[in-house]
Amino acid sequence: MELKDKKILVVGLAKTGVAVTRFLAQAGAFVTVTDMREEEALSDVLAELSDLDITYELGRHVPYSFLMADLIVVSPGVPMDIKPLEMARSQKRRVVSEVELASWFIKAPMVAITGTNGKTTTTTLTGEIFKACGFETFVGGNIGNPLIELAESGQEVSRVVVELSSFQLEGVESFRPDVAVLLNITEDHLDRYHSFQEYIDAKLRIFENQTADDFAVLNIDDPLVAACASKLKAQLFPMSRLHELEEGISYRDGFITFSHKGKVLRFGTEGFKLKGVHNLDNIMASLASTLLMRCDGDCAYEAVKNFKGLPHRMELVEEIDGVAYYEDSKGTNVGSVVKSLESFDSGITLIAGGKDKGGSYEPLAPLVESRVSHLVLIGEAKARMNEALGSLTDTHLAETLEEAVEISRRLTKPGGVVLFSPACSSFDMFKNYEERAQRFKAAVRAGKKGEA
């Protein structure tokens, strides 16, 4: 689509909206930006865009602007079912996401990764493998830089790796990755979606425009993921920790085996720095994606062995008086916390809670009952979590994260583990999950210094 002189409306002025606005303005479009927040709340953002000739509609959405736009680009934080967007679609206005817009201007081969959990680790590792194997690589999307920044920069790259949330996938039309990865699906974001099926449908849009020339990497150990295999137009490339595969990538007895069209590569896992059963899925997905896109096996293996993982994902903070403190603030849904709890056999003090996302906490029940010695709950969700899980183990309610850490310190015996894995978002008490993580680390280290 030619952007010059087109009337384009950008909905939402968070990080992605700012990047889209800058790209469109520099492409010669007539850009209007709308956000429900008032000007005072957006002062920093507006300063970033002060050099551009654009129109602002703040504190409200003006229906006329939606109806007159040649194109509407929606930021991922804005629900697609708000009334102005529904009205615009009913009048045949074109409504897309930033990822869709960016894809029109990016020609390099692309790996796109989605799933409820593990996206960021898999995306980062995939990018590291490509770079180690000599490919000029852009890594972005839901992680780090919006994809549109690659289009804006004009940077020549030979590989693109993009992490995609369900929100970003809602607004795709023609977006077509060469390799699309679906890691897992568990309940999440039910505070935004009307049903779990609606969330699943958003995830599956990653495969919508693929053809038989492309690959779909599916974790067939997840029944919801496996169920979509029959609907694919791309070539299925399965991954599994439970089954040996003649075609695909699988794990058995300390080795990952990649099998594709008669080519077989085996990788020992003993030297991997990235620990945890759940990370085997992330590693297999990264290896599958990069090997399918012409990475050398030895080079890819070395990159995996050297990858240490990311902060806020099962990060060991300190070991104090024989107790290990793990920070897993990125564990914002139940499925993620299940994976984290499975990394320990028993003796866990679990700190959980935050802003309730509307899903069921019942999937945690067997692990809480069998492995969690003490449960400490915080935040807006603590009452509902206590109702679902409180009777299964020794349970305590705390008003602050710092109080939760102090309670955990008193309760946990040497040899035990304090795991902060919230199963909730952070927005009831913190700006984001990073701030929540830093507060947990500070509280842990304050105890080490005897300040608590």
Curated annotation (Swiss-Prot):
InterPro entries: Mur-like_cat_sf (IPR036565), Mur_ligase_C (IPR004101), Mur_ligase_C_dom_sf (IPR036615), Mur_ligase_cen (IPR013221), MurD (IPR005762). Coiled coil: none annotated. Disulfide bonds: none annotated. GO terms for biological process: cell division; cell wall organization; peptidoglycan biosynthetic process; regulation of cell shape. Its main location: cytoplasm. It comes from the Bacteria. One of its GO terms (cellular component) is cytoplasm. It catalyses: UDP-N-acetyl-alpha-D-muramoyl-L-alanine + D-glutamate + ATP = UDP-N-acetyl-alpha-D-muramoyl-L-alanyl-D-glutamate + ADP + phosphate + H(+). It is found in: Cytoplasm. It holds the Pfam family Mur_ligase_M. GO terms for molecular function: ATP binding; UDP-N-acetylmuramoylalanine-D-glutamate ligase activity. Its EC number is 6.3.2.9. Pathway: Cell wall biogenesis; peptidoglycan biosynthesis. ATP binds at residues 115-121. Keywords: ATP-binding, Cell cycle, Cell division, Cell shape, Cell wall biogenesis/degradation, Cytoplasm, Ligase, Nucleotide-binding, Peptidoglycan synthesis. Cell wall formation. Catalyzes the addition of glutamate to the nucleotide precursor UDP-N-acetylmuramoyl-L-alanine (UMA). Belongs to the MurCDEF family. This is UDP-N-acetylmuramoylalanine--D-glutamate ligase. The lineage of its organism: Bacteria, Pseudomonadati, Thermodesulfobacteriota, Desulfuromonadia, Geobacterales.
